């Protein structure tokens, strides 16, 4: 399991980055979600890696 926390704002980001964050369930700064680690989630993290902090649970 991965704990993904949004650390930076989505304001002014490219639309694909905003949609990726929303697809992960991240909408507000400081919000965290737990996801199972797989290729799809890892690709999403690569897209918005500079906006989030990822921890292994």
Curated annotation (Swiss-Prot):
One of its GO terms (cellular component) is cytosolic large ribosomal subunit. Keywords: Ribonucleoprotein, Ribosomal protein. SUPFAM superfamilies: Ribosomal protein L30p/L7e. GO terms for molecular function: structural constituent of ribosome. CDD domains: Ribosomal_L30. One of its GO terms (biological process) is translation. Part of the 50S ribosomal subunit. Belongs to the universal ribosomal protein uL30 family. HAMAP family: Ribosomal_uL30_B (MF_01371_B). This is Large ribosomal subunit protein uL30.
């Amino acid at each position: 399991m991965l704990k993904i926390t949004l650390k930076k704002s989505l304001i002014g980001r490219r639309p694909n980055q905003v949609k990726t964050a929303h697809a992960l369930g991240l909408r507000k700064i400081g919000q965290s979600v737990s996801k199972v680690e797989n290729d799809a989630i890892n690709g999403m993290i690569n897209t918005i890696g500079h906006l989030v902090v990822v921890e292994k649970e």
